[in-house]
Curated annotation (Swiss-Prot):
UniProt organism field: Haemophilus influenzae (strain ATCC 51907 / DSM 11121 / KW20 / Rd)
UniProt keyword Endoplasmic reticulum, yes or no: no
Record text on cofactor binding: Binds 1 zinc ion per subunit.
NCBIfam families according to UniProt: PRK10437.1
Enzyme class: lyase
One MF term in the entry's GO annotations: carbonate dehydratase activity
Cofactors: Zn(2+)
Keyword check for Nucleus: no
Record EC number: 4.2.1.1
Disulfide bonds: none
Name of the protein in question: Carbonic anhydrase 2
Keywords per UniProt: Lyase, Metal-binding, Zinc
Underlying gene: can
Protein family per UniProt: Belongs to the beta-class carbonic anhydrase family.
Binding-site residues for Zn(2+), renumbered to this chain: C42, D44, H98, C101
Length: 229
């Protein structure tokens, strides 16, 4: 069986199994969706949002792009956010990065990759902005640190969109969260950047960057100690 036909075979088996487990499953799903969460994640095939959160279809609204970015000129992402906030009345938006992210590594390599370079420029801007946290780290730790910083920056970007600010101003319950998924062990890690208002956004963002600064200093001290022993 060729690869495309295999997908249809997989779909048939799945649909049959779901109907056997619950005869009204697809009818209920067709009637409405009631997700409580919007997931903004990376396009990487190793980070399947529904699977790693153990949620079913209809429970998680998902948008994915390279390196889980929220860019103020990206109308694709912003349209998803607006629909989630204004129509679905989602209460939680999660921005999730992940370890060993190809987008992060590509941005760090700074090679000519064609069209995608325009997208990666946003990651490179973050790198230059926080270069003091990245310069002395090993390449592997530098990528992990940039992944964490990127998550904090994207949560901050999201909180500054007119969509989210308007929701908060009218008293709508809406929380923003920044997480990192570790592809090495399958666990999600809360990065401690969380906001429920414009005020908490500023505080949470500053605190998250400050914590990463402390972590950076500890990593440098460990590296210096190992090199001198």
């Amino acid at each position: 069986m060729d690869k495309i036909k295999q997908l249809f075979a997989n779909n048939y088996s799945w649909a049959q199994r779901m109907k056997e487990e619950n005869s009204t499953y697809f009818k209920e799903l067709a009637d409405h969706q009631t997700p409580h969460y919007l997931w903004i994640g990376c396009s990487d095939s190793r980070v399947p949002a529904e699977k790693l959160t153990n949620l079913e279809p209809g429970e998680l609204f998902v948008h994915r792009n390279v390196a889980n970015q929220v860019i103020h000129t990206d109308f694709n992402c912003l349209s998803v956010v607006q629909y989630a906030v204004d129509v679905l009345k989602i209460e939680h938006i999660i921005i999730c990065g992940h370890t060993n992210c190809g987008g992060i590594h590509a941005a760090m390599a700074d090679k000519d990759l064609g069209l995608i370079n325009n997208w990666l420029l946003h990651i490179r801007d973050i790198w230059f902005k926080h270069g003091h946290l990245l310069g002395k780290l090993s390449p592997e730790k530098r990528a992990d640190m940039l992944t964490k910083i990127n998550v904090a920056e994207q949560v901050y970007n999201l909180g500054r969109t007119s969509i989210v600010k308007s929701a908060w101003e009218r008293g709508q319950k809406l929380s923003l969260h920044g997480w990192v998924y570790d592809v090495n062990d399958g666990f999600l890690v809360d990065q401690g950047v969380m906001a429920t208002s414009r005020e908490t956004l500023e505080i949470s963002y500053r605190n998250a960057i400050a914590r990463l600064s402390i972590l950076d200093e500890e990593n440098i001290l460990k590296k210096d100690h190992l090199e001198n022993t």
